[in-house]
Amino acid sequence: AGHMAWMERASAGAFRICTTVDDLRACLSNGTISGIMHMEGAEPIGPDLDALHLYHAMGLRSLGPVWSRPTVFGHGVPFRFPGAPDTGAGLTQAGKALVKACNRLGVMVDLSHLNEAGFNDVARLTEAPLVATHSNAHAVTPSTRNLTDRQLAMIAESKGMVGLNFATVFLRPDGRQSPDMPWDAVLRHLDHLIAKLGEDHVGFGSDFDGATVPQGIGDVTGLPALQDVLRAHGYDEGLLAKLCHRNWFAVLDRTWHPPR
């Protein structure tokens, strides 16, 4: 949080921490780089949740209760291939309180890295759409980190969202980390997610934080190449705009609100 605040101060207006969808739209229209403060793994927040309110005041608007390990809030899925996300117990009492507090504050709860029992608990408790910011289809790549068709159906019912993860271990049908892979695997995941969720509920989740990604993408500068591949695959400009930003704006608009 402090580093993002420093980036905003040091950028001379080129970077902005966004806490509303109007902020995001303004940045898109004027060319400002926008950032959403997200916490992956809620270890910095204790079970009393006092720190959650401090982070929210600093701009936190998206939170994953766990990374792929246990916390005081729940259990993350270990990285296994092949494997299923049914890997342990659900949310703790502190985890359930965290979901409710996020709902009251208007903080999006991220289901990526959460095991199946925890996913089910969030689905029962939350008042917001179900969102997995960087996960793929288990039916295509049977990794513990990917979402089963049953989970996708629950996300669809909530009018939620899945962001496609570019990490090769979650894209390749063999679960390997190698970046040398055809575009076909990316297309299979996107086609499956759109078939299960509808084109209004899928976007890009990237995971550009050190994960091995397809060599055709490489980093954020490879996104235009991905768009060209999707055009050749038959995706029209309207669908590309949804995948790139419109669907994220829409689900955040349904999730973010002033504290209540």
Language-model-derived ranges and their functions:
Residues A1-L49, S68-F73, V77-A89, Q93-K96, ...:
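A metal-dependent hydrolase metal-coordination microenvironment
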Residues R16, S34-H38, R61-S62, G106-M108, ...:
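Structural preference for beta-strand elements that scaffold enzyme active sites
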Residues T20, G59, V109, H134, ...:
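Conserved, mostly hydrophobic/aromatic
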Residues D23-L24, P44-I45, R69-G74, L114-N120, ...:
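Active-site environment of divalent metal-dependent phosphoester hydrolases
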Residues P47-A57, F79-V131, T144-S158, D184-D200:
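Histidine/acidic residue-rich metal-binding segments in metalloenzymes
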Residues M161-F170, G175:
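A conserved active-site cap/scaffold subdomain adjacent to cofactor or substrate pockets
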Residues F166, K196-V220:
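Short acidic/histidine-rich active-site segments
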Residues G218-R260:
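Mid-to-C-terminal alpha-helical segments outside catalytic/metal-binding sites
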